[in-house]
Every structure is written in structure tokens, then in C-alpha cells.
Regions:
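Helical catalytic core of nucleic-acid polymerases
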Residues: 392-511
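Common nucleic-acid-contacting/processivity interface regions adjacent to the catalytic cores
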Residues: 288-420, 424-427, 508-511
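Non-catalytic nucleic-acid-binding interfaces of large nucleic-acid enzymes and RNP effectors
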Residues: 1-84, 209-210, 214-242, 277-282, ...
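Extended, Lys/Arg-enriched charged tracts that mediate electrostatic binding to polyanionic substrates
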Residues: 92, 98-118, 213, 219, ...
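Conserved DEDDh/DEDDy metal-dependent 3′-5′ exonuclease domain
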Residues: 152-263
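Acidic, Mg2+-coordinating catalytic module of metal-dependent nucleases/exonucleases
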Residues: 184-199, 203, 246-343
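Conserved RNase H-like, two-metal-ion catalytic cores of nucleic-acid enzymes
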Residues: 3-48, 52, 83, 89, ...
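Short helix/loop capping segments that flank catalytic or ligand/cofactor-binding pockets
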Residues: 116-119, 144-146, 200-201, 257-259, ...
Length: 511
């Protein structure tokens, strides 16, 4: 049995937290969790090894802060202290089991409201205009529904086959019925289009202002909704309201992440036509006029937006991909946009399964504006002459595996002199220092080598070549050297994922 979602609750004591967990059985579990780190110790006390062979043991009573005002109290020699407690809890509980859960309740939805000003963040927070309809599709039971504002009382409450139309005489009635329906549906995943930016924040703030904060917060099974407006430090990019206990997956954001191409337009109408052959319902004038003059077509319009979403996922299967990645990284689905969260979780789970404790992240990482050999050109939509396409299979992962790149295999790097990066006042990136390049240079020329501890030494090029060849080091094009006597963790995990990829591709062909 696997998890569907997990959230860190209140603090019970030092490094002791309440965890809210939902698994495939759908039951809400509240579990106490002691967030352990590891500390360096003698060999006879050790239960694990560090990535570089250090002897370590678990510790519960530890302190750590990145804030310079408090860092003097940090426990020295800590390992694996800087991952979110809920993610460490999932790693402890599920280890390297990557199987996604299978009993999610997924709701595709869309809201409509009266037209107003530009949809800025401030405008959405104020939510000044009434919501006129909310449509949804419940995937697990194949049922459709819509709450529609019907001040003229033109409609009757109808349910035909798997589609229900619920008219409401006032917006307050509509919003109250939606809150009740939302609790009844009890979704694990809420899917919309541009919903992280518009639908969810607008709906939340409108319920907040028209009914009450308590009613708005009741959208969460835990009664907790976090918002950028009420939080001093907000770290979620492109998401402004977080309903704790409901995972929001904005299909537009998923498409931008997984499609690997720029679209001429990200309007749902355009994307729907391109990938599903289905457009939005056409009408004359604006939506407000349609709502006033032809409420039946308006209902079709709202349902069609949800239908396009449903068909997009049947075609693109981004939800399944999100689940697979998230379970590999042991994190919630709405965090799939951050690649490092997935990578950190997957690597940590693998290391701990081997009795190795992940190292702490560098508290003072080096930030560089540009990296030689790491230039990426963003695609530009349009028609161009004299272009060709060279598709190298999974270029970056293949480079990582072939060079055996890893934190524990890093030997050092050749420092490129600043003057070599600027020619006639312009930055350049052609500064190759791979083995063959070194052999073409003046063998008596001296270069600076920096080790992983950032200490430097000056060596002749002939000495660097001897170091590389005597130790059978792999060297990247920009002069970074790696050991090859044992596989790095990154190489091991990527090789495993590539093997799985071949299996899945073969199964796809068989199907």
C-alpha cells in the first residue's frame, strides 16, 4: 500500500512532528514522527556510513539553522538534516518502493465569474466579481456536475445519466453548495487549467469574502489553507493558495514542464484543438452576455472546458507521469515542478537503502551566472530557413553516466582564467579542457586545479595529464575530473531508471 498525500502537522517537541498521511485505503492517519539526522561518530558507535565513508549514527536532539544569527548553535558534523521532515518520513516508511497509489479521487474542474478587470494577482486576491458557475468531472465514478447561478429561475435541478445540473438562485447558495459538494467528493487531486494562478485562488478568496474564512478553509480536510496573502515567507512559485490535504495539479503548468516545447498560445481552446481536436464552445459577444441571454449554451461552455481537460489527460497522461515521478522522489504531487525535490528524494532513498547517509547540502553554494558548456537556447516559435535537428538521446543523463558524475566521485576541476572567458569585451564559452584538448596545449603551461574543498594548487599541464591517466579519471569538456573506480550514486540511479524506461517502452509497443 502506498501513500496518496502526506503533510507535516503541528510540532510536538524538538524535531518531533505530527504527520498527516493518506494511503490507498483512504483512511486519514495521524502519526508522530521524530525527525532524525545523523552525526559523525567513532567506528564502534556507527550504524551507517557517510557518502565519503564517514562513520555516523542517528541523533534526535540536534539543532540546525541557515540563519547566521542562530547558526552558532548548530550541532557540528550533521548529515541529512536539511530535508523537509515529511519527505524524510516518506523515505523512512516506503524506502525505495516507487509504486504509485492507485485509489486517488481526481476532480477536473473549472469556474466562471463575471467579467472585471485584468487578472492580476492583486485583482484575484480581491475577488470582486460573483462566481456564476462551477463545473467538475469526477474521474473515478465518471460523473459530471455543475452549479449554475440562476437568478431568473430558468432551470430545474436535473440529473440525466451521469450529468447533474444544480441551479442556485444566489451566489451565496452556489458557494455554500459547492463547499458541501467538495467535502462530499473529498478529492485527493484537483485538476484545472491555469488553476494555480486563477481558479483556486479566486474561488478561495471569493468564498472567504462572501461567506467566511472558516467556510473557505473547510475546503481542506484539515481545515488549513495557506495563502501568499497571509504568509510572510511564501516559497511556492506560481501557486498562491495551497489547500492542505488536496493536491493541486495545474494542467497548463504540467504541459509547460513535460511537453519540452513552446506553444504559440497556452489558451485552453488552442491546446485543446491541437491535442484533442476539441475546441471551446463558440458564442457571440462576451461571456457575461452569453450568461444573461443563453444560459443553456453557457452551461455547455463550462462543461466543455472540463471535457477538454479530461481528454488532454487521456491523451498526454501527465497525471500518471506526475505520480510516478513523485513516488520516486517521495514527495507530494504538487511539488513535481521542482526537479531537485524529486532528485533529492530518490537519491536519499537509494543511499539509505545501501546503509549510506546522504550528505548535507552546501550551506554556502557557489552561484555562477554562466557555466562553460552549459548554455541552453530557449526555443522560439516560428518558421526558419536552413535549420536541422540533431536529437541526442537523453543527452544530460548520458553525460552524467559516461563521466561518472557525482558528489562523491568529484576529484577537482581546472579553473578557467577570467581573461580566457572574455575576448574583445565579449563573454565566450569555448574553453575546452578535456584530456585531448590538454594534450594540444603547451605542456609547460600552468593551470590552477581546485579540489572539492575549494582549495587550489597550480600544476603544469603535463602533470595534470599524468594525474588523469595514472588514476583513470574521466574529464568533462570544461575540465571537471571524476573517479571511475566505482559508480557514482547518480550513475547508479540513472542506469536503473534507463533500464525501467526500456521495459516500459517495450510494454507500450506490446500494448
Amino acid at each position: 500500500m502506498s501513500y496518496k498525500k502526506c503533510y507535516q502537522g503541528k510540532k510536538l517537541g524538538p524535531n518531533h512532528y505530527e504527520m498527516h498521511l493518506w494511503e490507498d485505503d483512504g483512511q486519514h492517519q495521524v502519526v508522530g514522527y521524530k525527525d532524525k539526522a545523523y552525526i559523525e561518530c567513532s567506528k564502534d558507535q556507527a550504524t551507517h556510513r557517510g557518502l565519503k565513508g564517514e562513520f555516523v549514527k542517528p541523533i534526535i536532539d540536534w539543532k540546525f539553522s541557515k540563519n547566521p544569527e542562530y547558526s552558532s548553535d548548530n550541532t557540528p558534523g550533521l548529515h541529512f538534516q536539511d530535508m523537509p521532515p515529511y519527505q524524510k518520513f516518506l523515505i523512512d516508511k516506503y524506502g525505495t518502493n516507487d509504486d504509485p497509489s492507485t485509489t486517488h479521487k481526481e476532480i477536473f474542474f473549472d469556474i466562471e465569474c463575471e467579467m472585471g478587470g485584468a487578472l492580476t494577482e492583486e485583482y484575484i486576491e480581491s475577488a470582486p466579481k460573483p462566481i456564476t458557475s462551477i463545473a467538475w468531472y469526477d474521474k473515478q465514478v465518471d460523473e459530471w456536475g455543475i452549479l449554475i447561478l440562476d437568478k431568473k429561475q430558468q432551470l430545474n435541478h436535473t440529473k440525466a445519466k451521469n450529468k447533474e445540473i444544480i441551479p442556485c438562485s444566489t451566489e451565496v447558495e452556489l458557494l455554500k453548495k459547492f463547499v458541501a459538494k467538495f467535502k462530499e467528493l473529498n478529492p485527493d487531486i484537483l485538476v484545472g487549467w491555469n488553476s494555480d494562478y486563477f481558479d483556486i485562488p479566486y474561488l478561495y478568496y471569493r468564498i472567504y469574502s462572501v461567506i467566511s474564512k472558516k467556510a473557505a478553509n473547510s475546503l481542506s480536510p484539515l481545515g488549513i489553507v495557506k495563502s501568499k496573502r497571509e504568509t510572510k515567507f511564501w516559497w511556492k512559485k506560481d501557486q498562491y493558495v495551497d489547500i492542505i490535504g488536496v493536491e493541486s495539479l495545474d494542467y497548463m503548468r504540467l504541459h509547460k514542464k513535460f511537453s519540452f516545447r513552446d506553444e504559440p498560445s497556452y489558451k485552453l481552446d488552442v491546446i485543446g484543438e491541437k491535442y484533442t481536436g476539441l475546441n471551446k464552445i463558440e458564442y457571440n459577444g462576451n461571456l457575461d452576455k452569453l450568461f444573461e441571454e443563453d444560459i443553456y449554451t453557457f452551461i455547455q461552455y463550462n462543461f466543455r472546458d472540463v471535457e477538454i481537460l479530461k481528454l488532454l489527460d487521456e491523451k498526454l497522461e501527465y497525471l500518471a507521469l506526475t505520480k510516478n515521478l513523485s513516488h520516486k522522489g517521495k514527495h507530494n504531487y504538487s511539488e513535481v515542478y521542482a526537479n531537485t525535490r524529486t532528485q533529492d528524494g530518490a537519491i536519499s532513498a537509494y543511499l539509505l537503502s545501501q546503509g549510506v547517509v546522504p550528505p548535507a547540502k552546501d550551506i554556502n553554494p557557489i552561484h555562477k551566472k554562466n557555466y562553460a558548456g552549459g548554455y541552453l537556447f530557449c526555443p522560439t516559435a516560428g518558421i526558419f530557413n536552413y535549420m536541422f535537428d540533431e536529437d541526442l538521446t537523453s543527452l544530460y543523463p548520458s553525460i552524467i553516466m559516461s563521466l561518472n558524475i557525482g558528489k562523491e566521485t568529484l576529484v577537482g576541476r581546472i579553473m578557467i582564467s577570467p581573461e580566457k572567458l572574455v575576448v574583445e569585451g565579449k563573454e565566450i564559452f569555448d574553453c575546452r579542457h578535456a584530456l585531448n584538448d590538454l594534450k594540444q596545449m603547451d605542456q609547460d603551461e600552468k593551470l590552477i586545479i581546485q579540489n572539492p574543498q575549494r582549495r587550489t594548487i597550480e600544476m603544469k599541464i603535463s602533470e595534470i595529464i599524468k594525474l588523469i591517466e595514472d588514476n583513470n579519471l574521466a574529464v568533462s569538456a570544461n575540465g571537471v575530473m571524476y573517479r571511475t573506480d566505482s559508480d557514482s550514486v547518480l550513475k547508479t540511479i540513472l542506469s536503473k531508471w534507463f533500464d525501467e524506461r526500456v521495459i516500459y517502452k517495450n510494454k507500450m509497443k506490446e500494448a
